[in-house]
């Protein structure tokens, strides 16, 4: 239940067991996180919750029991949760983020990435909530990095176009909103396929089989907990300064191809990497990708906002539960 102020607890002593309703001290600052079941959304929800915010997350298929189940394509459902909870901040993480899926399901992707984002922005404006819309470095074509916030976007694929159209829909419906563009993400995944970085781990571990790895596209892997920290810092700055709005960039600062990431992963776990083969040609299958869409983050850095986890440290923290000889640990620790 959104905004509850009481919870049930069990009081047990030998010979007696009572169910007691107790008052709960809920922080005054309220944040709503969409896509809270996803890799980034989980990190954002956790970051706010651990820093004296009353955080409510919403999801759809995987929402229960931890999060509110909300279909973002249902405008009535969106209206009700926002007007019932009255958040000070909304972090909109929900999106179709897989470029190849967007190419194959353009209408469904546009409904979520564009239409739902515009409606969320309108509802946020109605209650005076500060909306942070999570966008992507794929709004740029990758031919002239690094990109500043005011540089003209030119997406190469439909995913980038839907994220750019989502930005426009958000800012048209909510003049006080913020757009946060970010690159490829990794972090504490529930399964390796949840991130385009962590999904490489099995190829790294199975060293008896050669694996082709992209060595063409330049990426800047970014830990979700760093993005979550930036979202919280941005929200807290905004609560003190209403002029904090518009478009912002955040990114890790270690430039790597997927081949270089895979080699770094192997090195972090003292695994061989000689079976990994760098492919320097431009990919011919799937949605077109930008060669180098590096983001200039100086605007946020000037505001004193930012956090960066070194890739070697972050990836080791994220992947150790998935080591083949220690995979049983997932059931205990992950």
UniProtKB/Swiss-Prot annotation:
InterPro entries (UniProt xref): dTDP_dehydrorham_reduct, NAD(P)-bd_dom_sf, RmlD-like-bd
Keyword Nucleotide-binding: no
Domain of life: Eukaryota
Region (Required for interaction with MAT2A): 319-334
Molecular-function annotations in GO: enzyme binding; methionine adenosyltransferase regulator activity
GO terms (BP aspect): one-carbon metabolic process; S-adenosylmethionine biosynthetic process
A Pfam family it matches: RmlD_sub_bind
Cellular component per GO, a single term: cytosol
Modified residues annotated as Phosphothreonine in this record: 309
Tissue note: Widely expressed.
List of residues binding NADP(+): 37-40, 60-62, 71-72, 93, 97, 159, 185
Recorded metabolic or biological pathway in which this protein acts: Amino-acid biosynthesis; S-adenosyl-L-methionine biosynthesis; S-adenosyl-L-methionine from L-methionine: step 1/1
Key words of the record: NADP, One-carbon metabolism, Phosphoprotein
Subunit and interaction comment: Heterotrimer; composed of a catalytic MAT2A homodimer that binds one regulatory MAT2B chain. Heterohexamer; composed of a central, catalytic MAT2A homotetramer flanked on either side by a regulatory MAT2B chain. NADP binding increases the affinity for MAT2A.
Function (record text): Regulatory subunit of S-adenosylmethionine synthetase 2, an enzyme that catalyzes the formation of S-adenosylmethionine from methionine and ATP. Regulates MAT2A catalytic activity by changing its kinetic properties, increasing its affinity for L-methionine. Can bind NADP (in vitro).
Note: Its expression in hepatoma cell lines may lead to increase DNA synthesis and thereby participate in cell proliferation.
PANTHER family: DTDP-4-DEHYDRORHAMNOSE REDUCTASE, METHIONINE ADENOSYLTRANSFERASE 2 SUBUNIT BETA
Family: Belongs to the dTDP-4-dehydrorhamnose reductase family. MAT2B subfamily.
Name listed for the protein in its UniProt record: Methionine adenosyltransferase 2 subunit beta
Species whose genome carries this gene: Homo sapiens (Human)
Gene: MAT2B
């Amino acid at each position: 239940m959104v905004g509850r102020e009481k919870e049930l607890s069990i009081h047990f002593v030998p010979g007696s067991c009572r169910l007691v309703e107790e008052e709960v001290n809920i922080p005054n600052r309220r944040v709503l996180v969409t896509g809270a079941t996803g890799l980034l959304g989980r990190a954002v929800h956790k970051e706010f919750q651990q820093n004296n915010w009353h955080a409510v997350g919403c999801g759809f298929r995987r929402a229960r029991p931890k999060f509110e189940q909300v279909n973002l394509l249902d405008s009535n459902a969106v209206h009700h949760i926002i007007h019932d909870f009255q958040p000070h901040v909304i972090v909109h993480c929900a999106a179709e983020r897989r470029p190849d899926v967007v190419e194959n399901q353009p209408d469904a992707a546009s409904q979520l990435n564009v239409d739902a984002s515009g409606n969320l922005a309108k509802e946020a404006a109605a209650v005076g909530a500060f909306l942070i819309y999570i966008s992507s470095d794929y709004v740029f074509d990758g031919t002239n990095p690094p990109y500043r916030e005011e540089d003209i976007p030119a997406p190469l694929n439909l995913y980038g176009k839907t994220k750019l159209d989502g930005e426009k829909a958000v800012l048209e419906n909510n003049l006080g909103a913020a757009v946060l563009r970010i690159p490829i993400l990794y972090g504490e995944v529930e399964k390796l396929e949840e991130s385009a970085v962590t999904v490489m781990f099995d190829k790294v571990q199975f060293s008896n089989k050669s694996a082709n790895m992209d060595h063409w596209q330049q990426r800047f892997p970014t830990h979700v907990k760093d993005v979550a920290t930036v979202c919280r810092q941005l929200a807290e700055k905004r609560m003190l300064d209403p002029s904090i709005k518009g478009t912002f960039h955040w990114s890790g600062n270690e430039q790597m191809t997927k081949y270089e990431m895979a080699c770094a992963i192997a090195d972090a776990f003292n695994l061989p990497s000689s079976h990994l083969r760098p492919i320097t040609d431009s990919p011919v299958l799937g949605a077109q990708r930008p060669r180098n869409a590096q983001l200039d983050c100086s605007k946020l850095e000037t505001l004193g906002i930012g956090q960066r986890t070194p890739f070697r440290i972050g990836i080791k923290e994220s992947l150790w539960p998935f080591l083949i000889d220690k995979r049983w640990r997932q059931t205990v620790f992950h």
